[in-house]
């Protein structure tokens, strides 16, 4: 099917042609003929890189241009939202406005009403539904990317509830990797089902075992080791993507591979890699990353900072980095294809010990093999060490992906959603709640809601007992102020209960370590883990701070290993946050507490939200005397600063280090800086021309500074 055959606005056709698209892949053509341009719901289950997103783009833009209204594109990750935001910019050329919404769950974000296409994470859109944002009534089409994540234990319920709310109110398009029960999901959504295994680049799959790769067609190739699979790809001027099961392993394997890979590179390639390595900020994780990059290999995992993850992804796509060793986070929708994908580990650690990686995840990883426009064939290879290679082949290569199951019955998910139905959607009886539940994927799969009804009644009792709701003699449910605020804050009611229970102690002795320990014990945060080696030091620090904590010694009721671990994981997290707000350099925090930069940012983002939520719950409970203290602490958490730097944080391009440099140089307020001359600020370490120009523009003064080298620097001395 050619673009010219498409019965859509000419502006859509011209935009596609500007991208170099003249015709559609077979599954794209099938989807576009299925009725989605006429408003039918659709579930599109096709392989990675087969053009799922483009189908959704055309449907969204066509709907907006023909019927008005808005389109919402739901993604699972902030990084994916950023990627799609960049991709969708093309549509601004024809007059559509594109926006991205992630984070800040306590806002209606009415500004989004000015936009036509809104990209949001599932959690963000769920929070907007709870806040009753006025523009949501104008949403005519909703796309759920990675819809198979409805089966995710952590986040599936959120996506399911969004879809249940929007069914019948907007056209729904689900984009999915291959799943085991697409018919079931499509029937629930009342959607046309498009399933295909067609790929733009042929995928050749095999299993490596004891020096041989056995391909799915029965042919065999010899390789001396699994590492040789990487070196062979690089000799062919191709890239390799290796998946392992742990972060530390990703780092170790990347460093080991880089030693050999470097010998396969040209001098210009090594020069480009050295420049890349030199651009990284200094911290212990980045030191390892820089060392690996100098040898042409990088590692990628959630512990890396955002800038480092983007740097690795972009330079791997460009071919500067030759191989990437990653944990499966990289397979979650981010666009990083490679000629050869190697799955080094098919087992991973879980809460229940070692378990096999699901088939659906392995298929997603293997699906990254083959770069459209560059490769005629992509190769996906599973490394089998102790497992029977024939069984691995049958299970993963020829096996059918697992069925998806609703996660709505998970108690934490259900608790939050039941309160939201009462507090923000006006449901006032058990029957009304059950009627909503009857429209969910859970009810569709189970065919009855009896087992869920008992859980819902238990949740209602919990909400009643803890003053989130009240129930009249006529069994009418009414939300109380605590329930309404909790639902809109987008926190677990159990978190709000913990805040309520400890509020008196917080008011009596407000202190950072106590508050950080409290929020780190809530179900809304995943605290840092610790090793046996760290435990002794954590115990020592605990005795230093125990009088400032709001929770008793975990051993007070006898030894319980689960409670001990929970308590000290929260305590370690509190120590990291305390170091962060006391301006301890990131590298020192990484080294002292054995954490990664990406994890620090994740914890900081969540902690800021929970301190804000604690402040809001304090208002509801009338504890106004600590509101200002908590707001100050929230700002300190956000920026990682001591209190005296807060006034300087409103300056553009000024983070924690530049603010400290300004303060230590005598510029302690906005007024001090407004009276300074540009050359005075330029003398301060870390303050460059762009920063000074931005600061003065913020102050309403236009200053242009010619970029001259600073004569005091060693760099200038060496060049002169």
From Swiss-Prot:
Reactions it catalyzes: Couples ATP hydrolysis with the unwinding of duplex DNA by translocating in the 3'-5' direction; ATP + H2O = ADP + phosphate + H(+)
Binding positions (ATP): 23, 28, 46-53
Range of residues in the leader sequence: none
EC number: 5.6.2.4
Regulation: induction: Constitutively expressed (at protein level).
Annotated effect of mutating residue 146 to A: No ATPase activity
Location of the Helicase ATP-binding domain: 33-197
InterPro entries, per database record: DEAD/DEAH_box_helicase_dom, Hel308-like_dom4, Hel308_SKI2-like, Helicase_ATP-bd, Helicase_C-like, Helicase_Hel308, Hlx-hairpin-Hlx_DNA-bd_motif, P-loop_NTPase
Keyword annotations: ATP-binding, DNA damage, DNA repair, DNA-binding, Helicase, Hydrolase, Isomerase, Nucleotide-binding
Gene3D superfamilies: 1.10.3380.30, 5' to 3' exonuclease, C-terminal subdomain, P-loop containing nucleotide triphosphate hydrolases
Bilayer-spanning residue ranges: none
Any GO MF annotation of the entry: ATP binding
Gene Ontology biological-process entries: DNA repair
Domain Helicase C-terminal: 229-422
Motif DEAH box location, chain numbering: 145-148
Subunit record text: Monomer. Interacts with PCNA.
UniProt-listed NCBIfam families: PRK00254.1 (NF001308)
Family stated for the protein in its record: Belongs to the helicase family. Hel308 subfamily.
The protein, known as: ATP-dependent DNA helicase Hel308
Lineage summary: Archaea, Methanobacteriati, Methanobacteriota, Thermococci, Thermococcales
